[in-house]
Amino acid sequence: MDIVIVVISILLALIVGIVVGYLVRRSIAEAKISSAERLAKQIVEEAHRNADAAKKEALLEAKDETHKFRQQAEDEIRERRMEAQKQENRLMQKEENLDRKSETLDKRESSLESKEQSLTEQQQQIEEMKSKVEAMKDEQQAELERISGYTSEQAKQIILERIEKEVQHESAVLIKESETRAKEEADKKAKNILSLALQRCAADHVAETTVSVVNLPNDEMKGRIIGREGRNIRTLETLTGIDLIIDDTPEAVILSGFDPIRREIARMALEKLVQDGRIHPARIEEMVEKSRREVDEYIREVGEETTFEVGVHGLHPDLVKILGRLKYRTSYGQNGLKHSAEVAYLSGLLAAELGEDVTLARRAGLLHDIGKAIDHEVEGSHVEIGKELAMKYKEHEVVINSIASHHGDEEATSIIAVLVAAADALSAARPGARSETLENYIKRLEKLEEISESFDGVEKSFAIQAGREIRIMVRPDEIDDIESISIARDIRKRIEGELDYPGHIKVTVIRETRAVEYAK
């Protein structure tokens, strides 16, 4: 029972608690709802107030924007009106200009109509005058035919023939003048090219002689060179082919010989013997053979050096060795190898001025006198020998022709061949390049004057410019101007046929006439 009561009490207490809790929560909820409603009402009221303010602000902004837009619209309308006014003014000006142009065109049209009418009248007058002129021309032509006895065709033919002759004469004169001008310009250009080439060419060699001198330490060495009964000197002369001249010249022996290579071998051998001190036939033979080998090697080296200096490459080794032998070959005292190198250099310069192959020109110039290296060993002129060597070693056909034509033996078939001949003449005629002995020089000058004075009408002659020019004075009462030209040509032919000389000789004939009167 007690437990039931307790349980019922607990249940009642629990129900009362629940009811009380519900009521309390309900009162709290109602209080919150009331508070929320008040807050909501405040928010609504605040929102209404804010909305009214925003509405007023928006209205103000809208009014402001409307005012600005209206102002811009008015400004734009005003600008458009002004632009329309300007366009209207321009159109009015154009209209006025068109009106003025229209008036001008009307005036021109009326003027042209009047001019056209005037031209029509003038044309009619011209036609009438043409008819009259034709009639007068026919009458005059008939009258001329009657008077001259020629028809118009015959007269026309005569006039044409006369005009043709005049034109032919004038053409011949013009052609001659053109040829003269062309020759003068060609000569001037050639002189300029030659002068440029000579200015750019600096030669460093001088004339050489046909003797060599070997210095001795003392005069006792002369006896040792001669040897017992002259056996040493005979052995040396026999092995080298060179004459040894032992005279009163102190401490010197002179070697004389035409072949420069043999002379050089003899000089080197003799210097070695003098330096060694042992001089007897066996030693002489040994030194001569050693010197010969050294000279051969030197010839090869100097040939290679020359080709390198000139800029010519690809020569056959045998041809290089033959070229080196020109080192010991002279012409009128001018060293053959130096002359060939100078001709090669000049040929290259001339070819460069004319736009030709410089390398080929130098090659042809270097080999132009190659035949002189062995012309004393092989039959024929140095030109023929050089041509055969070039063909043997398969040189370029331009090189072969340059060798064959540089002395006029064959016709030059290329510009380079002509340039090589010109360079050869320049090198030979250069002052100091070639020389003669004093005796031959004097004899040549005397022979020059003798040849010149052997002609009739020659009063006297003078060899000047070291024998490079001969001036002949003729008697004016016996020789006229035309005969002066003939005498100059005849003297030139005599000189070419009877004299040997380096370079060229200028022949000048002078004819002077003087008229003298005395006033009293």
From Swiss-Prot:
Disulphide bond pairs: none
Region (Disordered): 81-125
Ranges of Basic and acidic residues composition bias in the record: 81-118
Domain of life: Bacteria
Main location: membrane
GO molecular-function term, one example from the UniProt record: RNA endonuclease activity
Start and end residues of each KH domain: 210-273
Keyword RNA-binding: yes
GO biological process terms held by the UniProt record: mRNA catabolic process
Sequence ranges assigned to domain HD in this UniProt record: 336-429
Membrane topology of the entry: Single-pass membrane protein
Residues that span the membrane, as ranges: 3-23
Nucleotide-binding keyword on record: no
Subcellular location: Cell membrane
Pfam families found in the cross-reference section: HD, KH_1, RNase_Y_N
EC numbers, comma separated: 3.1.-.-
UniProt xrefs under InterPro entries: HD/PDEase_dom, HD_domain, HDIG_dom, KH_dom, KH_dom_type_1, KH_dom_type_1_sf, Ribonuclease_Y, RNase_Y_N
Alphabetical UniProt keywords: Cell membrane, Endonuclease, Hydrolase, Membrane, Nuclease, RNA-binding, Transmembrane, Transmembrane helix
GO CC annotation: plasma membrane
Role according to the record: Endoribonuclease that initiates mRNA decay.
NCBIfam families per UniProt: HDIG, RNase_Y
Family: Belongs to the RNase Y family.
Listed name of the protein: Ribonuclease Y
